[in-house]
Amino acid sequence: MKLCGFEVGLNQPLFLIAGPCVIESEQLQMDTAGTLKEITASLGIAFIFKSSFDKANRSSGSTFRGPGIERGLEILAKVKRELGVPILTDIHSEDQIAQVASVVDVLQTPAFLCRQTDFIRAVAQSGLPVNIKKGQFLAPGDMKNVIDKARAAAREKGLNEDNFMACERGVSFGYNNLVSDMRSLAIMRDTGAPVVFDATHSVQLPGGQGTSSGGQREMVPVLARAAVAVGVAGLFMETHPDPSKALSDGPNAVPLKHMRALLETLVALDAVTKKNGFLENSFAA
């Protein structure tokens, strides 16, 4: 798959989608994106900056959601223009698609909306690449139906059918908990789409703090290493200069100061994992 000028897939080096969970301020976005650009460039990692203008699925209606679509897109456009990095952001309704697609390079659909057929079709017909997140309630094999819906919608408009990624972000395991079944990363390859692993939302404890979600950020490196060892096209990781002060998802954000060391390990592991290909299909009965 061609994505923002580079190729992604199991036969390509690992790429990274990273940034703060939500747009807190213009300065935070510029500083974080600049640091990530420097780190990824030095490590030879293709990089897409992400952040949200609106967190529409917060645990509580009283918590910070973001600057909104108008101001949020202004800030993302500045990051793109001044730093020269491609931008990903998520959308939550069909009426946002055209406006957001005019600014960003990649769209993302929330995990909760992966079964909303009309929404998936509308996003697919934007013409932009789309990172489609698997719902916390969905079996990995069911993502093929979701990707097929997107491809069919693109085909109807004469658009690129190979413009979609399948993103794993954990599965609900009882109340206020998620687990990551690493088999899902191999199963989701059957969609024919590049598979991305969301290493930060996978350690989230949804609603675990009453009016906000908790998280186990110390487990991000553990799951990220495991996913890269299985073999994925890319990683999604939210990061913040000071997660303890982040306005959204701080408990599962990677401290920005540790991002370089983590990525150095993951790049080395990715090279080993992909060096000799994958034997899974040969092992099938």
UniProtKB/Swiss-Prot annotation:
InterPro entries with a match to the protein in the record:
Aldolase_TIM, DAHP1/KDSA, KDO8P_synthase
Report keywords, A-Z: Cytoplasm, Lipopolysaccharide biosynthesis, Transferase
Spell out the Pfam families in the cross-references.
DAHP_synth_1 (PF00793)
Cellular component, GO annotation: cytoplasm
Question: Has the keyword Transferase been applied to this entry?
Answer: yes
Pathway(s) of this molecule: Carbohydrate biosynthesis; 3-deoxy-D-manno-octulosonate biosynthesis; 3-deoxy-D-manno-octulosonate from D-ribulose 5-phosphate: step 2/3; Bacterial outer membrane biogenesis; lipopolysaccharide biosynthesis
Q: What is the name attached to this protein's record?
A: 2-dehydro-3-deoxyphosphooctonate aldolase
Q: Which GO terms describe its molecular function?
A: 3-deoxy-8-phosphooctulonate synthase activity
Give the source's domain of life in one word: Bacteria
- Which family does the record assign? Belongs to the KdsA family.
Recorded E.C. number(s)?
A: 2.5.1.55
The principal localisation class reads cytoplasm
Tell me, what is an example of a GO biological process annotation in this record?
A: keto-3-deoxy-D-manno-octulosonic acid biosynthetic process
Q: Which reaction does it catalyse?
A: D-arabinose 5-phosphate + phosphoenolpyruvate + H2O = 3-deoxy-alpha-D-manno-2-octulosonate-8-phosphate + phosphate
Which principal EC class is assigned to this enzyme? transferase
Q: Does the keyword Protein biosynthesis apply?
A: no
Location in the cell? Cytoplasm
